């Protein structure tokens, strides 16, 4: 209710009354004094008071705007000020009356919209000279995007890199457009796709986003919302040819936009909404309004809001922010706009406007300057009842979905045209070249056609043999009539002395001395429609692992994740390797996970990050390790013996005793005989296909995924030729391809009815089940060595993901005021999804199986898990390894019981073998309830026994019976904690009374959505139903049953144990999908996916961290020993001018300053074939031919070193120092005094892993910062080349108010801090002690492009490393505190000013190796800034934080050796974290 007017004594100041809602607002007319319509009770008092002079506030806008709900709400509140009277100029007056006749006013709120005569408003303001809330002259500029961008640039506000194309006949020099296949060049500036095309008029909302051909091409066309759509996907890929446009870099925002609404320079309200570019569907609530979520702005973003407000002189102003790679860019300024449907905003806005007007026009009242208290200052953190555990992190490694068979052909080429092609695309720099883009493949096709034409004229002996391969090359490249860029690639490798003669019957005596190229053509391997469906379904099922929301978000299970994601409390990053099928799987998964609609291309570009630059998820299949070569040779030798397997063969081939391996060998018995049978069956198959092709009925027959009989015949004929060599021996490496092909045809082309395919499948599967897993190592030691070689970067990344459990200040947070009824609104669930190929999944599983995670002799649960894994014969498509991290907030933060890890696994899609042969696991079983009063009939894991299953025969229709060791399950270990709070945010009252506390959704998924997916099982299949007792993380079975159209008998809910045996999850149902995409005669099968099985649910974070660290350390030590001899020889042979100098003697010429690049600093040099310039972010292994070296970078290194200690990853390595960058194409050997533990391979990795966390050390520095230090050379470049994440350090920095004469003292301060922090490191248990990081490399581990920076500001660069104490070991938790101190070094920011110049980009062929770790590391640092994040103080106090002090203004004398010039004084950094005005 509104308050009554103030008494006479109080009327000396203007008053503002806060309202509770809409009720009661309509009783008072606008423009009326508050007293005129108040109760008569106060009439007598009013009669005694003479009438007060009024300040008249005029509203001059179109009726649609001035009578809108937000405006009405705000004006009603504005009228509550005693001295303000509001008048609204009618539209008729504005349009038709001369300005002289307009009513006069003291204050004018006027803004432009469609049809508004801005000229008349300007004339009126000149005539009456009112106080303008929003400047009118600036509104002309806001209507032109070119002017908006110009002003933003002048104000130093970050915006995407852009160029303007003016199609103006008077200025032809501004209209230079060159359009390519995957880029445009605008007036000399090149924009690779994806890029954005915006009309220059701000009133034109037809913005187009163009996608690269590698992602599927086409464009997304955005427009003003029409009904439920805000954009539509179009296959058109060429830009518009009429009109003037702004072209700008596409910002990968993970599918969300932030809209900011300012009211004056000190108040900003922000809301997040789904990006219209994602799928174009507008999410609306029950009242039909677009769903938006209020989010909290970071300190940097508040500073941006202030700058925008002041620069455009618009008190009330809306603008759009893009949060990309942890940094914020302004992409649009809309001028006057209000928040819709936020009572708090209406209250705040009216109060600020009223106060602003009164202070300006009635200064005698001396109204204090106060802005409404920010909601984030109110610590609303509801506690949970009981000891619930909270889901904090989900890490999943997932293999791609069902694909077409992969095919490969190799040929040696020596024609000069191939060499010139190789040279043209820069192949000589690395000796290798990968061609995937359509124009590149077209060049290869042109050369092939030319050579074939020449061969027809001059047929020759040896050339005849090549003719067949050239024909095949031509036919594959011509296959679809166009190049999609995803399904074919050509690789060329340079051999200076010719390709070595292979063992396939070629003349080994011929000695080839002339240089040649090995051409490898790869095709096939595309994701099938079935694969897309599998990925989307798995994404949908994955939702059910996350906390549930209060009420149903969209009326179907899994709503918890959607609510979590929409409110920005879900920190999701999806990574995919280089391959198209992997990227499309990731996009389809994201589509299901986040309930998106439409095409995969926009989802792929915005949601999927590319991790292809550094081996995180890719592996160079052409360069096998020596261990792999040995293993393959031994495998081939054993399988070439024409005799039954004997005991010795079993020992040689299956030393691990794997159950699946032994059973496959039992099927094979004599490998050569089985290969003979397989070869005969393939011959028979090709014969049948040829016959079928002669049949007139089959002429136009279309097989699955648009394949023809001719293409199918090509596929099998090639295998027939290659499998049996000229010598009569069999090429064992073709067995996986044969199995691949026959599995594909049985599943997708079964309607052809070809004879013998079932037997071929049985035999080839038996062979493949031996060959495929054994290619990754035969003995345990080999398996582990090969596994770590494949996935060392991924292991380190997982280690980082697990250890970064603290909160991040700048991650998008839901406004606490709007999160009542939400469990711990300030917390986040971090999800990291890694989509990759078979090799990484095999390798990662080998690490867990053979790396010594647990002692199986002492841990029966792990013993059972290993037995289950041993029985798995194939890691099929969509195999998942899932790691879930829980936190128990009731435990001491440093105790081992604080964090709890679970390991789950699924072997992927159901194979084509009989269902009964599937191995059974122990079910999906997160740690179950520890309720003391639990009864046996509550279905706890320990009390399940096979007997119960037989009591319910009609409901126990599971394909996998309960494990026989059911009664022998171990009693609960102390680590199996209480039921996870992660399972639901808020338990409804009804659910808590039900046995087991399962939350039942009020309704299942609407039938419309089921129809869209075309599948019967909606969320099914993620979890094994063998055991679900006590698992509130598991999805609700009743919902599954409902989605299957089944009815649970009422009795089934009486006891939880009975619920376990309901056949709600059809584990292996095969959908004969009536999907239009599902291929041949609608009968293609989409197999369901095996549910997740729990391998272990009682691990501590410390156990897992130490295990991963140990594995990584063992590998690096082994590599170091192997490369020590190599280093010695290389070092002794160095010439005096060798690029490899000993540490501490580095002197290289000063780097010349370059002009600032047009690319934003986060811009990496471009993914090779992925779409997502969305910054990759992951650690890297240094390629042998890596063009980047590790130059000295002291300024950033101090940050990095601190971050590393905080992560617990920094270990002492003796004698570390600075290295000079290696020459291009050379690998960097060890320095003499380097630790033998550190191999060259992983040198850059630590640096990159940290780069993510370094992103925003300076985010919350006070805003009175105006003069950046201009003398520092190129620090922005590391971001541009390699770290999307360091981009924040370059850009998000407020500018310092006093110019910094010399940056040298900053180095002193930072190194002093490093020294102090290092010296404080006491003995603390280290969860990550196994990751040795050579400090010299860490400190100087930035790319070559930054090398000269050291010389600009530093005389001697080797020093920072020397100052680091020897015993450097610090645990994650204890060190997390000290980052705050660094954050307060405001001076540190000067070095990272946006105005600093940059060095040139590296060539495009070398995408930034270090680029990948960007976004996530920043998250960890931000939360360490304790003075900005009040909710962290509690946590930090438990860790005995030293009091944070302002740094002294004088330089530390101990660090003077770092700076060449000690004379320039450095102003003290301010520690005041508030904005001052």
UniProtKB/Swiss-Prot annotation:
It catalyses: 1D-myo-inositol hexakisphosphate + ATP = 1-diphospho-1D-myo-inositol 2,3,4,5,6-pentakisphosphate + ADP; 5-diphospho-1D-myo-inositol 1,2,3,4,6-pentakisphosphate + ATP + H(+) = 1,5-bis(diphospho)-1D-myo-inositol 2,3,4,6-tetrakisphosphate + ADP. Substrate binds at residues 64-65, 224-225, 259, 273, 337-340. Its main location: cytoplasm. Residues 382-453 are annotated as: Polyphosphoinositide-binding domain. Keywords: ATP-binding, Cell membrane, Cytoplasm, Kinase, Membrane, Nucleotide-binding, Phosphoprotein, Transferase. Residues 27-47, 910-1016, 1131-1248, 1438-1477 are annotated as: Disordered. It is found in: Cytoplasm, Cytosol; Cell membrane. The keyword Kinase applies. ATP binds at residues 145, 198, 205, 224, 248-251, 257-259, 275, 320, 332-334. The modification Phosphoserine is found at residues 940, 983, 1033, 1069, 1141, 1148. One of its GO terms (cellular component) is plasma membrane. It comes from the Eukaryota. It is an enzyme of class 2 (transferase). InterPro entries: Acid_Pase_AS, His_Pase_clade-2, His_Pase_VIP1, His_PPase_superfam, VIP1_N. Its EC number is 2.7.4.24. Residues 37-47 have a biased composition (Acidic residues). GO terms for molecular function: 5-diphosphoinositol pentakisphosphate 1-kinase activity; ATP binding; inositol hexakisphosphate 1-kinase activity; inositol hexakisphosphate 5-kinase activity; inositol hexakisphosphate kinase activity; inositol-1,3,4,5,6-pentakisphosphate kinase activity. Residues 1001-1016, 1446-1460 have a biased composition (Polar residues). Belongs to the histidine acid phosphatase family. VIP1 subfamily. The C-terminal acid phosphatase-like domain binds PtdIns(3,4,5)P3 and InsP6. Despite its similarity with the phosphatase domain of histidine acid phosphatases, it has no phosphatase activity. Bifunctional inositol kinase that acts in concert with the IP6K kinases IP6K1, IP6K2 and IP6K3 to synthesize the diphosphate group-containing inositol pyrophosphates diphosphoinositol pentakisphosphate, PP-InsP5, and bis-diphosphoinositol tetrakisphosphate, (PP)2-InsP4. PP-InsP5 and (PP)2-InsP4, also respectively called InsP7 and InsP8, regulate a variety of cellular processes, including apoptosis, vesicle trafficking, cytoskeletal dynamics, exocytosis, insulin signaling and neutrophil activation. This is Inositol hexakisphosphate and diphosphoinositol-pentakisphosphate kinase 1. The lineage of its organism: Eukaryota, Metazoa, Chordata, Craniata, Vertebrata. The gene is PPIP5K1.
């Amino acid at each position: 209710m509104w308050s009554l007017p103030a008494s006479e004594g109080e009327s000396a100041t203007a008053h503002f009354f806060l309202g509770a809602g809409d009720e009661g607002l309509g009783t008072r007319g606008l423009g009326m004094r508050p007293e005129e319509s108040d109760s008569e009770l106060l009439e007598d008092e009013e009669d005694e008071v003479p009438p007060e002079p009024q300040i008249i506030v005029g509203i001059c806008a179109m009726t649609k705007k001035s009578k809108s709900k937000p405006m009405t709400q705000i004006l009603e509140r504005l009228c509550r000020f005693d001295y303000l009277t509001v008048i609204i100029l009618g539209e008729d007056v504005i349009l038709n009356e001369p300005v002289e006749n307009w009513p006069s006013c003291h204050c004018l709120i006027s803004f432009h919209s469609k049809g508004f005569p801005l000229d008349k408003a300007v004339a009126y303001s000149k005539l009456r000279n009112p106080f303008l809330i929003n400047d009118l002259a600036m509104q002309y500029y806001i209507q032109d995007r070119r002017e908006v961008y110009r002003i933003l640039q002048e104000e130093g506000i970050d915006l995407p890199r852009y160029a303007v194309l003016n199609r103006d006949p008077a200025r032809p020099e501004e209209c230079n457009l060159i359009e390519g296949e995957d880029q445009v060049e605008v007036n000399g500036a090149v924009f690779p796709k994806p890029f954005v095309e915006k009309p220059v008029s701000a009133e034109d909302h037809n913005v187009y986003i163009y996608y690269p051909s590698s992602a599927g091409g086409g464009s997304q066309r955005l427009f003003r919302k029409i009904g439920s759509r805000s954009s539509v996907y179009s296959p058109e890929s060429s830009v518009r040819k009429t009109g003037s446009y702004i072209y700008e870099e596409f910002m990968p925002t993970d599918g969300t936009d932030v809209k900011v609404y300012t009211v004056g320079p000190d108040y900003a309200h922000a809301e997040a909404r789904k990006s219209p570019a994602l799928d174009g569907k507008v999410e609306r609530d029950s009242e039909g309004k677009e769903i938006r979520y209020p989010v909290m702005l970071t300190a940097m973003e508040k500073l941006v809001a202030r700058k925008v407000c002041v620069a455009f002189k618009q008190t009330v102003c809306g603008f759009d922010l893009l949060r990309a790679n942890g940094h914020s860019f302004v992409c649009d300024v809309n001028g006057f706009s209000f928040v819709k449907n936020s009572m708090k905003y209406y209250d705040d806005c009216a109060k600020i406007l009223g106060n602003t007007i009164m202070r300006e026009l009635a200064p005698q009242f001396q109204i204090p300057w106060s802005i409404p208290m920010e909601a984030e200052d109110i610590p609303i953190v509801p506690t949970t009842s009981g000891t619930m555990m909270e889901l904090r992190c989900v890490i999943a490694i997932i293999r791609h979905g069902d694909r077409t068979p992969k095919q490969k052909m190799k040929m040696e080429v020596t024609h000069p045209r191939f060499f010139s092609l190789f040279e043209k695309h820069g192949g000589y720099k690395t000796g290798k070249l990968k061609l995937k883009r359509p124009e590149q493949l077209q060049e290869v096709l042109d050369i092939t056609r030319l050579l074939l034409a020449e061969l027809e004229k001059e047929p020759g002996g040896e050339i005849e043999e090549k003719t067949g391969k050239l024909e095949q090359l031509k036919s594959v490249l011509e296959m679809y009539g166009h190049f999609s860029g995803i399904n074919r690639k050509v690789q060329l490798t340079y051999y200076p002395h010719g390709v070595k003669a292979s063992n396939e019957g070629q003349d080994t005596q011929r000695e080839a001395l002339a240089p040649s190229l090995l051409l490898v053509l790869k095709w096939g391997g595309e994701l099938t429609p079935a694969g897309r469906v599998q990925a989307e379904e798995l994404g949908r099922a994955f939702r059910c692992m996350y906390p549930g929301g209060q009420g149903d978000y969209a009326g179907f299970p899994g709503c918890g994740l959607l609510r979590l994601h929409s409110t920005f409390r879900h920190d999701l990053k999806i990574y995919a390797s280089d391959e198209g099928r992997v990227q499309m799987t990731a996009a389809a998964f994201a589509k299901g996970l986040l309930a998106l609609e439409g095409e995969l291309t926009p989802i792929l570009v915005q949601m999927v990050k590319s991790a292809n630059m550094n081996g995180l998820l890719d592996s160079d299949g052409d360069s096998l390790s020596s261990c792999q070569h040995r293993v393959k040779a031994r495998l081939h030798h054993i399988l070439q013996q024409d005799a039954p397997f004997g005991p010795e063969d079993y020992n040689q081939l299956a030393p691990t005793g794997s159950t699946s391996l032994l059973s496959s060998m039992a099927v094979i018995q004599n490998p050569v005989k089985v290969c003979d049978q397989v070869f005969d069956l393939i011959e028979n198959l090709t014969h049948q296909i040829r016959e079928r092709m002669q049949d007139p009925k089959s002429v136009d027959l279309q097989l699955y995924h648009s394949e023809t009989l001719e293409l199918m015949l090509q596929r099998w004929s090639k295998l027939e030729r290659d499998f049996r060599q000229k010598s009569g021996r069999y090429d064992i490496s073709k067995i996986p391809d044969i199995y691949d092909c026959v599995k594909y045809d049985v599943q997708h082309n079964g309607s052809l009815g070809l004879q013998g395919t079932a037997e071929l499948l049985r035999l080839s599967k038996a062979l493949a089940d031996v060959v495929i897993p054994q290619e990754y190592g035969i003995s345990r030691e080999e398996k582990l060595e090969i596994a770590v070689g494949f996935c060392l970067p991924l292991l380190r990344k997982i280690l980082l993901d697990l250890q970064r459990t603290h909160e991040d200040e700048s991650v998008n947070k839901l406004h606490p005021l709007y999160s009542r009824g939400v469990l711990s609104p300030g917390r986040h669930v971090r999800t990291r999804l890694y989509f990759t190929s078979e090799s990484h999944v095999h390798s990662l599983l080998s690490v867990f199986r053979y790396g010594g995670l647990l002692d199986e002799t002492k841990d029966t649960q792990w013993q059972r898990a290993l037995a289950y894994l041993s029985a798995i014969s194939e890691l099929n498509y969509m195999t998942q390894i899932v790691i879930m991290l829980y936190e128990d907030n009731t435990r001491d933060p440093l105790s081992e019981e604080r964090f709890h890890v679970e390991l789950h696994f699924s072997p992927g899609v159901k194979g084509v073998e009989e269902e009964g042969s599937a191995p059974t696991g122990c079910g999906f079983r997160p740690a179950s309830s520890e309720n003391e009063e639990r009864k046996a009939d509550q279905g706890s894991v320990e009390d399940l026994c096979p007997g119960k299953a037989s009591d319910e025969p009609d409901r126990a229709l599971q394909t996998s019976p309960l494990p026989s060791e059911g009664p022998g399950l171990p009693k609960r270990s102390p680590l199996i904690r209480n039921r996870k709070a992660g399972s639901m945010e808020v338990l409804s009252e009804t659910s808590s009374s039900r046995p087991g506390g399962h939350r039942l959704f009020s309704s299942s998924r609407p039938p419309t959505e089921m129809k869209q997916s075309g599948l019967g099982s909606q969320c099914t299949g993620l979890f094994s139903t063998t055991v679900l007792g006590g698992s509130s993380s598991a999805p609700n079975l009743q919902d599954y049953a409902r989605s299957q159209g089944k009815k649970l008998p009422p009795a089934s809910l009486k006891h939880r144990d009975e619920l376990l045996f309901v056949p709600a999850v059809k584990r292996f149902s095969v959908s004969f999908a009536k999907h239009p995409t599902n291929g041949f005669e609608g009968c293609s099968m989409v197999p369901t996916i095996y549910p997740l099985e729990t391998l272990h649910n009682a691990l501590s974070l410390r156990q897992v961290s130490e295990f991963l660290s140990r594995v990584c350390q063992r590998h690096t030590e082994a590599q170091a020993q192997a490369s020590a001899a190599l280093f010695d020889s290389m070092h002794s042979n160095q010439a005096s001018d060798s690029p490899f100098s000993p540490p501490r003697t580095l002197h290289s010429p000063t780097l010349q300053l370059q002009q600032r690049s047009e690319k934003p600093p986060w811009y990496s040099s471009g993914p090779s074939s992925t779409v997502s310039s969305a910054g990759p972010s992951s650690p890297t292994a240094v390629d042998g031919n890596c063009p980047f070296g590790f130059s000295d970078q002291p300024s950033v290194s101090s940050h990095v070193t601190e971050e590393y200690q905080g992560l617990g990853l920094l270990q002492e390595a003796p004698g570390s120092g600075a290295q000079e960058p290696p020459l291009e194409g050379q690998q960097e050997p060890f320095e003499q005094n380097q630790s033998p533990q550190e191999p060259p391979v992983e040198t850059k990795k630590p640096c990159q892993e940290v780069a993510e966390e370094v992103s925003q050390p300076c985010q919350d520095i006070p805003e009175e910062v105006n003069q950046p230090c201009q003398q520092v050379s190129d620090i922005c470049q590391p971001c541009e080349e390699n770290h999307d994440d360091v981009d924040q350090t370059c850009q998000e920095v407020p500018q310092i108010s006093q110019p910094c004469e010399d940056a040298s003292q900053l180095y002193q301060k930072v190194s002093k801090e490093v020294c102090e922090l290092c010296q404080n490191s006491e003995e603390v248990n280290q969860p990550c002690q196994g990751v040795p990081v050579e400090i010299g490399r860490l400190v100087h581990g930035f790319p070559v492009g930054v090398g000269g920076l050291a010389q600009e500001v530093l005389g001697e660069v080797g020093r920072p490393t020397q100052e680091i104490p020897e015993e450097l070991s610090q645990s994650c938790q204890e060190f997390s505190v000290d980052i705050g101190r660094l954050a307060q070094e405001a001076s540190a920011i000067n070095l990272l000013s946006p105005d600093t110049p940059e060095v040139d980009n590296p060539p495009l062929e070398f995408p930034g190796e270090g680029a990948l770790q960007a976004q996530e590391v920043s998250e960890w640092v931000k939360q360490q800034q304790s003075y900005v994040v009040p909710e962290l103080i509690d946590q930090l106090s438990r860790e005995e934080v030293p009091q944070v002090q302002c740094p002294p203004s004088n330089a530390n004398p101990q660090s003077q050796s770092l700076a060449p010039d000690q004379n320039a004084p450095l102003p003290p950094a301010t520690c005041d974290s508030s904005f001052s005005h």
